[in-house]
Amino acid sequence: MTNEFHHVTVLLHETVDMLDIKPDGIYVDATLGGAGHSSYLLSQLSEKGHLYCFDQDQKAIDNAQVRLKDYIDKGMVTFIKDNFRNLKSNLEALGVSEIDGILYDLGVSSPQLDERERGFSYKQDAKLDMRMNEEASLTAYDVVNTYPYNDLVRIFFKYGEDKFSKQIARKIEQARQVKPIETTTELAEIIKSAKPAKELKKKGHPAKQIFQAIRIEVNDELGAADESIQEALDLLAVNGRISVITFHSLEDRLTKQLFKEASTADVPKGLPFIPEDLQPKVALVNRKPILPSQEELEANNRSHSAKLRVAKKIRK
């Protein structure tokens, strides 16, 4: 692994083991990141098996090409530089119409957070950016400096769930009338200035939720996850599985809802039986999310909010 792309994988064994790996199966890592999940999954495949890895960050792919070199040399890995919302079209272009399993590790990766110039973190001073795909056009700077007040309030409430969204949006509006808000530190200070003193004494950084909201907006994270997970459920072969790790309530609610819809028969109540073509195509493998062990929590602080949900395809 390259030094500049160090990433501690969360729920490593649980996420992959719950896929019930077939040695000669076809699998997808929808969120390559530091390639931790990919490396462990590939170790369980025979040379007849194959793993397709998605990431829109070229640095993640460059790192993985070094880390997974032995498997690449055996022809067991294909990298796809694209947003995972384009899952189905990319796989179909490669002749793949069915998969045995897929995993998602949603949210921003540690290297993206830690690389100052990517502009994700309120802990390091950098230009406002937050793009997971550095070739994308919309940046955090654009959101903060061009979105109307009402749109800022909407995304802060919807994606940040911050009860001071209106006050923060108003402060941003006032500040950018004087000069553009250009850096993460500037934005963090504006957010802090909008919150009452007693709120600033609470645990956690006062800018955390707003930075999350802007990042989700810049990358359309929830829209992409919604589209991709639905496509993944469709692509799964019978007995194929999907593992999804989430790190905040918005991602977890979305995943839970998609799994619930796919695992529930869409028929009126009171029918004496459910016709086979209306039976659910998916079953939940775990009704409650799997959480990190105490050992993992102590070893990796970033795992504390992680939740893993798993579902299984039961019919086409």
Swiss-Prot record:
Free-text function comment from the UniProt entry: Specifically methylates the N4 position of cytidine in position 1402 (C1402) of 16S rRNA.
Annotated gene: rsmH
GO biological process, one term: rRNA base methylation
UniProt-listed PANTHER family: 12S RRNA N4-METHYLCYTIDINE METHYLTRANSFERASE, S-ADENOSYL-METHYLTRANSFERASE MRAW
One Pfam family named in its UniProt record: Methyltransf_5
Protein localization: Cytoplasm
Coiled coil: none
Protein name listed in UniProt: Ribosomal RNA small subunit methyltransferase H
Domain of life (superkingdom): Bacteria
Principal subcellular localization: cytoplasm
Family label: Belongs to the methyltransferase superfamily. RsmH family.
Biological source species: Streptococcus thermophilus (strain ATCC BAA-250 / LMG 18311)
Molecular function terms, GO-annotated: rRNA (cytosine-N4-)-methyltransferase activity
EC number: 2.1.1.199
Keyword field: Cytoplasm, Methyltransferase, rRNA processing, S-adenosyl-L-methionine, Transferase
Enzyme class: transferase
GO cellular component: cytoplasm
Catalytic reactions of this protein: cytidine(1402) in 16S rRNA + S-adenosyl-L-methionine = N(4)-methylcytidine(1402) in 16S rRNA + S-adenosyl-L-homocysteine + H(+)
Residues annotated for S-adenosyl-L-methionine binding in this entry: 35-37, 55, 84, 105, 112
